[in-house]
Swiss-Prot record:
It holds the Pfam family Ribosomal_S17. It comes from Salinibacter ruber (strain DSM 13855 / M31). Part of the 30S ribosomal subunit. One of the primary rRNA binding proteins, it binds specifically to the 5'-end of 16S ribosomal RNA. One of its GO terms (biological process) is translation. Belongs to the universal ribosomal protein uS17 family. GO terms for cellular component: cytosolic small ribosomal subunit. InterPro entries: NA-bd_OB-fold, Ribosomal_uS17, Ribosomal_uS17_bact/chlr, Ribosomal_uS17_CS. Residues 1-27 are annotated as: Disordered. HAMAP family: Ribosomal_uS17_B (MF_01345_B). This is Small ribosomal subunit protein uS17.
Length: 102
């Protein structure tokens, strides 16, 4: 007689999806442009150390992010999160406005 071992997996697909959602990249940056409809351009600055000379250099990357309610304005500090492709260039969405521009 064959004995079948019952596979007891306590991990569900819903838990996998929740873990994946929490692993998304987040960046904090400044809104450079809010002229487009439901879209903002966010500049994210970072410091890197020069590999040979050791001097710290400032680098920046620009991301287009989805702003559903057109809430953010130029100069605001915002948090953006990686998401599914929304358009040709938009792969990020606005999570929260950390600080309003003065």
């Amino acid at each position: 007689m064959e004995q079948t071992e019952e596979h007891t997996d306590t991990h569900t697909d819903e838990q996998d999806e929740a873990v994946d959602r929490n692993d998304r990249k987040e960046r904090i940056g400044v809104v450079e442009s809010a002229k487009m409809d439901k879209t903002i351009t966010v500049s994210v600055r970072r410091q890197m150390k020069h590999p040979m000379y050791g001097k710290y250099l400032e680098r920046s990357s620009t991301f287009m992010a989805h702003d559903e309610g057109d809430e953010a304005n130029e100069g605001d500090t915002v948090r953006i999160m990686e998401t599914r492709p929304i358009s040709k260039n938009k792969r990020w969405r606005l999570v929260e406005i950390i600080e309003r521009a003065k």
